[in-house]
Regions:
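Bacterial Sec-dependent N-terminal signal peptides
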Residues: 1-30
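Beta-rich interaction/scaffold domains
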Residues: 19-120
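Extracellular carbohydrate-recognition regions
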Residues: 111-156
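Extracellular polysaccharide-targeting segments
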Residues: 122-123, 266-281, 314, 333-357
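Short carbohydrate-recognition loop motifs
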Residues: 168-188
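Extracellular-facing segments of soluble proteins and assemblies that are Gly/Ser/Thr-biased and enriched
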Residues: 188-269
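Extracellular beta-strand ligand-recognition surfaces/modules
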Residues: 249-260, 301-346, 352
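Extracellular carbohydrate recognition and processing domains
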Residues: 268-319, 342
């Protein structure tokens, strides 16, 4: 039996290696770093698969901005690195691999710390085969939510949009809502030590880390105000069997959902928090945590206060400089980052609101 398992895992790894090799040219068309002159940025640029986000102090100063990029070896970019452009609206760049066979289009956006405090979950688009949620500010600035859907696609490439852990439902408290479902990641997910994927939605970004999956979630976006409450509506049903990371059933226990928010200081050593430290890191100053996690067939209203972590406080100077981040996190399984969860656990959330000073 052990020998048979060895051959199965070997075959899976060989298949995965073949997939990676076949897509390697595309990996040679990446933006690695981005720089701009002066003190315009309040945070290091956030570079995702096809997007670069630049958090800036003033949008009036981006009308003649000339960002410089470093690329994967031999790749070229159009327009060329250092070209001055008007970033009052997002700009597009095309990166071409060294052999000329692969191209990747990037959207580069300049964002301010404009606050969006009402989340209706009406706005979602299908990107790369799965739902992506976003909100739009009064001025038209778009802020995207993140999820682990990209990781699920890696293990379940044939899934339809509604079969991903994070999707949109028509059955909201008012209109549409976000639907989060804990899913099995199949044989390939188990191979990498990630047998389940909890449905999640959070402020921040998601970058796949195959070796430490819990570090794939980069929680938080810049926030220059003091948050006081997070409120909204939820419905929740736990899956039938709670299992651990190895797939063993945990008797006499049920899964629970999780809704919480964390306000923390950002430093050069701690640019973000992830699934390994989002509730425990010493940089956390304020935290709001849902404690009433009961299962319910009807919508339940919640309002959770931000509480100060003992011995910590907000530095007003750093707050004005944008040195704090706010992470709002929704999950269908509270221990999903540790892969202890029940397949089928389902959380609906709607009409959420952030209050602040």
């Amino acid at each position: 039996m052990k020998l048979q398992n060895f051959f199965i895992i070997t075959a899976l790894l060989f298949t995965l290696q073949s997939c990676i090799k076949s897509e390697a040219p595309n990996a040679e068309a990446d933006i690695l770093t981005c720089e701009v002159d002066g003190n315009l940025l309040i945070r290091e640029p956030i570079i995702q698969n096809t997007e670069v986000k630049l958090y800036v102090t003033d949008l009036d100063k981006v009308k003649n901005l000339a960002p410089r990029f470093t690329l994967t070896q031999g790749a070229t970019i159009s327009p060329t690195s250092g070209t001055a452009r008007n970033f009052s609206t997002p700009q597009t760049y095309v990166v071409t691999s060294e052999d000329g066979n692969w191209q990747k289009t990037y959207k580069v956006s300049c964002l301010t710390n404009e606050i969006i405090a009402h989340y209706h979950f009406e706005n979602a688009r299908i990107t790369d085969g799965y739902y992506t949620f976003y909100d739009t500010s009064v001025s038209g600035q778009e802020i995207a939510w993140s999820s682990g859907n990209a990781g699920f696609k890696f293990t379940n490439s044939n899934a339809k949009p509604d079969e991903f852990p994070t999707s949109q439902s028509e059955s909201g408290y008012r209109g549409k809502c976000v639907k989060l479902v804990t899913q099995s990641t199949g044989v390939l997910g188990k191979t990498f030590g990630a047998p389940i994927a909890a449905g999640n939605l959070f402020t921040g970004s998601f970058e796949i880390d195959l070796f430490t999956p819990a570090k794939s979630t980069h929680f938080g976006i810049p926030f220059k105000r003091k948050p006081t409450h997070l409120s909204g509506y939820y419905k929740y049903k736990a899956g039938e069997k709670l299992t651990d990371k190895k797939g063993n059933v945990i008797p006499n226990q049920k899964d629970k959902c999780d809704i919480y928010a964390v306000f923390y200081e950002v430093t050069s050593q701690v640019p973000h928090l992830d699934g390994t430290n989002i509730k425990t890191h010493n940089n956390i100053v304020l935290m709001a945590q849902l404690t009433d996690k009961r299962e319910t067939d009807n919508w339940v209203q919640f309002s959770i206060p931000f509480k100060t972590i003992k011995g910590r406080s907000i530095d007003t100077k750093k707050l004005k400089e944008g040195k704090y981040s706010l992470a709002i996190v929704l999950s269908s399984s509270e221990k999903g980052a540790d892969f202890t969860a029940a397949v089928g656990s389902t959380l609906y959330v709607d009409e959420m609101q952030l209050s602040y000073e």
